[in-house]
Regions:
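Active-site cofactor/cluster-binding pocket
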Residues: 1-190, 195-203
Length: 203
C-alpha cells in the first residue's frame, strides 16, 4: 500500500457546521531506500493543495475565501447544489447569492474547476452525495486510485452497495461530461439546488 494520512476539522456554529476533511497521500513506498519515512501535515496549507472537493457551492466559496486554491496547481471538484443560508432565506424577495460569481471565481482561482450538480446525481442513484464525490475524484485521475479498485472497495463495504456503485458511476461520468462541456467553445457550468459540506485533499 501507499502511505496516507487523513484528518478532519469539525465546523463550529450555533447548531451545525461544515467539517473539512484533509488527506495527504504519497505515491511512493512508506520508507525510501535511505530509510526516510514521510512526515504528513495535520491541516491544509493555503495554495499547497492538488485537489479540493466540495459538495456544496457556498462551501466552495469559503475555500476560495481561505485562499486554499492555487491557479497553477489546484483542481477543484464541486457540486453546484445549494443549501440556502439563513441570510438568504430571511429576505422578503429573492435573497439567494449570485452563484455565477462563485463559479467565475472558482474558474479563475484554480488550475481547473469541474462543477456539476452532484446532489441531483445522488438523488437519481438513491444514495448520498459522498458516493458521487468519490466517483468524481476517481475520474479526475489525480490520485493513484483505479476505477476498479474504488468499486471493489465499495463492494467490500457490504452496505448499500448497489446504490453506492450507481452514485459512484454517476459521479465518474458526470465529471467527464462536465470537463468536456467546460472545454467546448461557448459553454459554461450550470447551477442547481442541494445540500452538503466542504472537503479538501492535498498530496
Amino acid at each position: 500500500g501507499l502511505p496516507v494520512q487523513a484528518t478532519s476539522v469539525p465546523g463550529v456554529a450555533q447548531r451545525t457546521g461544515a467539517t473539512s476533511y484533509y488527506l495527504e497521500l504519497l505515491p511512493a513506498p512508506m520508507v525510501d531506500r535511505e530509510g526516510r519515512a514521510p512526515v504528513f501535515c495535520l491541516s491544509p496549507t493555503s495554495g499547497d493543495l492538488d485537489l479540493v472537493v466540495s459538495s456544496e457551492l457556498l462551501e466552495t466559496a469559503r475555500a476560495l475565501e481561505r485562499g486554499l486554491l492555487d491557479e497553477t496547481r489546484t483542481v477543484l471538484i464541486s457540486s453546484t447544489g445549494r443549501a440556502l443560508t439563513v441570510a438568504e432565506k430571511m429576505q422578503q424577495a429573492d435573497g439567494r447569492f449570485d452563484l455565477g460569481r462563485i463559479e467565475r471565481a472558482a474558474q479563475a482561482l484554480s488550475r481547473e474547476a469541474v462543477l456539476f450538480d452532484m446532489q441531483a446525481e445522488a438523488r437519481a442513484a438513491g444514495t448520498v452525495i459522498s458516493s458521487v464525490l468519490f466517483g468524481a475524484i476517481a475520474a479526475s485521475g489525480l490520485l493513484p486510485l483505479p476505477r476498479a479498485a474504488c468499486e471493489a472497495t465499495i463492494r467490500g463495504s457490504g452496505r448499500g452497495v448497489a446504490q453506492s456503485l450507481a452514485g459512484f458511476s454517476r459521479g465518474f461520468d458526470g465529471f467527464v461530461r462536465a470537463r468536456v462541456a467546460r472545454s467546448a467553445p461557448g459553454t459554461g457550468t450550470g447551477t442547481g439546488t442541494g445540500t452538503g459540506t466542504g472537503a479538501g485533499a492535498g498530496a
